[in-house]
A protein has these predicted regions:
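Short acidic-hydrophobic sequence patches enriched in Asp/Glu that either
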Residues: 191-194, 235-242, 279
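Extracellular loop and loop/strand-boundary signature of outer-membrane beta-barrel proteins
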Residues: 184-187, 235
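TPR/Sel1-like alpha-solenoid repeat signature
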Residues: 167-170, 198, 213-216, 246, ...
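Alpha-helical adaptor scaffolds
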Residues: 205-255
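N-terminal alpha-helical interaction modules that lie
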Residues: 1-184, 192-206, 273-309
């Protein structure tokens, strides 16, 4: 994943099933594990994507792909518009990328997002990060995918400093990468402060960004879990009350989200331990009872169900 595009080749790759023109990364994505709960159940074809968009994107407040929303994004971030093909080309690619993402076809979502150019990097990066965190079983491949996403997002926020979801996916990728190289190692390398700073930028641009609040809640909880309550507060500014504050904010913004609830339950255990075991189990129960709207929500419902058995 990178920010130098051959538009024609990228567009052809998004419509083809293979061939020698595929990049090494695209070829590796063909071996990605499939979403384990069916590839059609969360496929929002035709107008279904638009009619369900508000529910699907309540957590990140991303605008539905259209000529108007694309124009507003580029007005706010002019560097995104350099050499951009017309909306008649880009908008369908973005719609299809998001369809693939919500359906759990994460490799296709990456390919189609990349084909749309820098404006497609949010969906591409999010698809790759979700795949790596939830489905990739090989540790070295998981770290490699997340490292690529971090590098892409670091470049994206330079092009689009006023795009809340560019900052959000950057924070998501940094957080997942930190988890997989070990939180302690990540803190030593300065990633902890960067995760917090990046997610705070997302919230500053979009105060109703529930997913960014989740990311910040996870950050505080994981630092506390790894270095202890006192060291976390003194050295990294991580606090138990911030865990609760961020997750309660996320739950108020996106009630009945299994993503919010499952991460809330896990973070409660990390930050508070056995003293809040009952609360964590109750929140896992809430997550398990949710009706998932897309592949990521289904993965988190299944996770919660496993915790309640």
């Amino acid at each position: 994943m990178h920010l130098t595009f051959d538009w024609g080749a990228a567009f052809r790759r998004s419509r083809q099933s293979g061939g020698p023109a595929e990049s090494d990364q695209a070829n590796r994505r063909r071996s990605w594990k499939r979403f384990p709960y069916g590839d059609r159940i969360y496929r929002y074809g035709g107008t279904a994507l638009k009619s369900n968009w508000a529910r699907l994107h309540r957590g990140d407040r991303e605008a539905y792909p259209s000529a108007e929303s694309l124009g507003a994004l580029i007005d706010a971030n002019p560097a995104l518009g350099a050499s951009l093909p017309p909306p008649t080309v880009v908008v369908p690619l973005l719609e299809d990328a998001w369809r693939a993402y919500h359906a759990g076809d994460f490799a296709d979502a990456v390919d189609r997002g990349l084909a749309a150019g820098p404006v497609g990097l949010v969906v591409s990066a999010r698809a790759a990060a979700v795949y790596a965190a939830h489905l990739e079983e090989d540790e070295s491949r998981r770290v490699e995918i997340l490292r690529d996403v971090v590098e892409s997002c670091a470049s994206l926020v330079k092009l689009a400093p006023k795009w809340a979801n560019a900052w959000y996916v950057y924070g998501l990728a940094l957080g997942r990468y930190s988890q997989n190289i070990s939180v302690v190692r990540a803190l030593a390398q300065g990633f902890g402060g960067r995760v917090r700073e990046v997610l705070q930028r997302a919230i500053a641009l979009e105060p109703a960004h529930a997913d960014a609040h989740v990311g910040l809640g996870v950050y505080h909880a994981e630092v506390i879990d790894k270095v202890g309550v006192m060291m976390a507060a003194l050295t990294y500014g991580a606090r138990r009350d911030a865990v609760t504050e961020h997750f309660e904010a996320a739950r108020a913004l996106h009630p009945q989200s299994p993503v919010v609830l499952a991460e809330y339950a896990r973070s409660t255990l990390l930050a508070f331990g056995v003293s809040e075991l009952g609360k964590a189990h109750r929140i896992f129960d809430e997550a398990a009872a949710c009706q998932p709207a897309d592949a990521l929500e289904r993965l988190d419902v299944e996770w919660a169900l496993g915790e309640t058995e």
